[in-house]
């Protein structure tokens, strides 16, 4: 199986961070931006760094953009360019287009024109920061939909020394514990009699409201 290839269009702070992380993870990444200075900054980071206008169809074709597994439109300071680039990528047959949105209205437009995934980096980071500030237990969150997530959090004190069935997480809230990380061990799909311990890290799936309620328990 071939390694996934990514293209990141728009090398601002978000785009550059994305290029760095994907490259660090061992993937081939092409960085594209109309600004020569930004491209020069990524020459030593990306697999390929190209100065190009993403709204030029012939240029995108010449770059073989449709051959990339995922193309991320990370343009953040020009909504028109962001939207038109997304449209062009879909018209060129790119398999998966991920587009960065500035706000809800922008996101709705991106969804309407065919973006496969719309992301809100600033909003999501603000939510994550807010939750980490108000909760002593919250660690990480992966959004599966607008209403459901997989969340990682420390065992609240009120749940420590109780078995999963005794906590009522699944029966009362519909929250499923996928795994428990205990020191260097990971208990995958723990049974109902598994007892939670203080310091355990719980990985659970459920509605955002229920998960947030649990992480805020004392």
Describe the predicted segments one by one.
Residues 1-218:
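Cytosolic regulatory regions of ion transport systems
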